[in-house]
UniProtKB/Swiss-Prot annotation:
Name listed for the protein in its UniProt record: Sodium/hydrogen exchanger 9B1
Gene that encodes it: SLC9B1
UniProt biased composition (Polar residues): 16-32
UniProt entry tagged with the keyword Transmembrane helix: yes
Tissue specificity remark: Expressed only in the testis.
GO terms of molecular function: sodium:proton antiporter activity
Record keywords, A-Z: Antiport, Cell membrane, Cell projection, Cilium, Fertilization, Flagellum, Ion transport, Membrane, Sodium, Sodium transport, Transmembrane, Transmembrane helix, Transport
Length: 515
């Protein structure tokens, strides 16, 4: 008996350290002893850590070492560029301006990440990147030495758009779409089309836009930003909020479809605005471009599914490289031959078809594309911020732009709420989905300047309209991205039902199949 009891006590002591058994089920004496040992061991472990944090070690370590290392890397890159290209890397040169915008955007994003307000979720770093570019443009001394050619910025933004579309295509999960069915389709299509139509009507009567430009602006505003929505949905999902109802999955799946629709609508309107033919000719040309895009995307998508084969070395790297280069070539090449917008649809079809065959390998390819996006995101938002000058912002233009944006947002929120009324969600969940479907950032950062660049090249007399579109896109990012992020971070835990063990919950998507 004595031997058995001692063995049991020994097992209980070991299990206490590793198991998650509730404290009330453990012997209080053992608990007290273990807590005393734990406190002593923790104290012994903390002491050397405290000394390391109190005194600056030699050689330097920690944050200070990281700052110095990154600073030296930046300086060496500049020295190497200057030694190869000379004056291009000096103040006033094109590469110098690009470096300043890129690193300023990175610093702006890091600073915004460091800002922590109690009880308030962190703001998205892209807002800091946008403000960094805006600051560079509007500080006289810096602006005199920072110049980036319009051709360069146009190409970089087109590449950024390509990466967004690749991520959207790879992010479409066929299984989730089959489960969510009509609910996902409603959320992706309804609010986007209604906001685009509302923005077109309001901009036509308030901003005096022609109908073609009004709908072009509408599709610029119609897209939601996965860069803002997806990270917050992943955090909520990891903590078990709304998991059983499938709300995070629904929003993440629908965000890609929403962007696809908005970009397709924008490209169609852009081709109509800058074409010289009649309405019938434009419609026929649009249908032709769509057919060419679909055919090219299907052919290239099936090619990438089977080439390279699975027995090759560095398979993921080759697949990521092929998808990226093919899609960038499709987007830039279609612009070169006059098929504007065709490359975007080709990119979506290619990446979606290729991803359906890769299964588990798709996640690795997505990581490669995400790494490339981490490079182009500061460039994108820094260049967009640098396009906006305070001197060109007239108070009346800003006022009517904010009014148009606000009215269109109200229509979007109301439409989202009404469409979710028949999807089996509670009142609080519908409110949360409607507000979470508001943020704008990445698509607006790409499409807003695109109209301005096209006007500068093809139709300079239309440049005032394009500048107004750019202004509205800038204000949309500035207003909706931080507010949407704050609303999701604050209201998510309050309005969504939490399930305390999300790893054991099977998403009850079958409840949504009939809606």
């Amino acid at each position: 008996m004595h031997t058995t009891e001692s063995k049991n006590e020994h097992l209980e002591d070991e299990n206490f350290q590793t198991s998650t058994t509730p404290q009330s089920l453990i012997d209080p004496n053992n608990t007290a002893q273990e807590e005393t040992k734990t406190v002593l061991s923790d104290t012994e472990e903390i002491k050397p850590q405290t000394k390391k944090e109190t005194y600056i070690s030699c050689p330097l370590r920690g944050v200070l070492n990281v700052i110095i290392t990154n600073g030296v890397i930046l300086f060496v890159i500049w020295c190497m560029t200057w030694s190869i290209l000379g004056s291009e890397a000096l103040p006033g040169g094109n590469l110098f301006g690009l470096f300043i915008i890129f690193y300023s955007a990175i610093i702006g994003g890091k600073i915004l990440q460091l800002i922590r307000i109690p009880l308030v979720p962190p703001l998205p770093p892209l807002l800091g990147m946008l403000l960094a570019g805006f600051t560079i443009r509007n500080v006289p001394f810096i602006n005199e030495h920072v110049h980036v050619p319009n051709t360069w910025s146009s190409i970089l933004r087109s590449i950024a758009l390509t990466i967004i579309l690749i991520r959207a295509g790879l992010g479409l999960d066929p299984q989730a779409l089959r489960h969510l069915k009509v609910v996902c389709f409603r959320l992706a299509v309804g609010p986007c089309l209604m906001e685009a139509s509302a923005a077109a009507v309001f901009s036509h009567f308030i901003m005096k836009f022609p109908w073609q430009w009004a709908f072009l602006l509408g599709f610029v505003l119609g897209a939601v930003s996965p860069a803002v929505v997806v990270p917050y949905m992943m955090v909520l999902q990891e903590n078990g909020y709304g998991v059983e109802e499938g709300i995070p999955t629904l929003l993440m799946a629908a965000s890609s479809m929403d962007d696809i629709l908005a970009i397709t609508g924008f490209n169609t309107c852009l081709s109509i605005v800058f074409s010289s033919g009649g309405i019938l000719n434009n419609a026929i040309a649009s249908i032709r471009n769509v057919c060419i895009s679909l055919l090219a995307g299907i052919v290239l998508g099936f090619f990438v599914r089977y080439f390279p084969s699975e027995d090759q070395k560095k398979l993921t790297l080759k697949r990521g490289f092929l998808v990226l280069t093919m899609c960038v070539s499709a987007v830039l090449g279609s612009q070169r031959i006059g098929l504007h917008g065709s490359g975007g649809l080709c990119t979506l079809v290619l990446s979606f078809i290729a991803g359906t065959k890769w299964s588990q390998e798709k996640m690795k390819v997505q990581k490669i594309i995400t790494t490339v996006w981490d490079i182009f995101q500061p460039l994108l938002f820094g260049l967009v911020g640098a396009e906006v000058s305070v001197s060109s912002l007239e108070s009346n233009i800003v006022g009517i732009s904010v009014a148009t944006l606000s009215l269109a947002l109200c229509v979007r929120i109301l439409t989202t709420y009404l469409l979710m009324c028949f999807a089996g969600f509670s009142f609080k969940e519908k409110i949360f989905i409607a507000l979470a479907w508001m943020p704008k950032a990445t698509v607006q950062a790409v499409l807003g300047p695109l109209a301005l660049e096209t006007a500068r090249v093809s139709a300079p007399h239309l440049e005032p309209y394009a500048k107004d579109v750019m202004t509205v896109a800038f204000l949309a990012i500035l207003i909706t991205a931080p507010n949407g992020a704050l609303l999701m971070g604050i209201l998510g835990p309050k309005m969504l039902t939490r399930h305390y063990d999300p790893s054991k919950i099977k998403l009850q998507l079958s409840t949504l199949e009939h809606h």
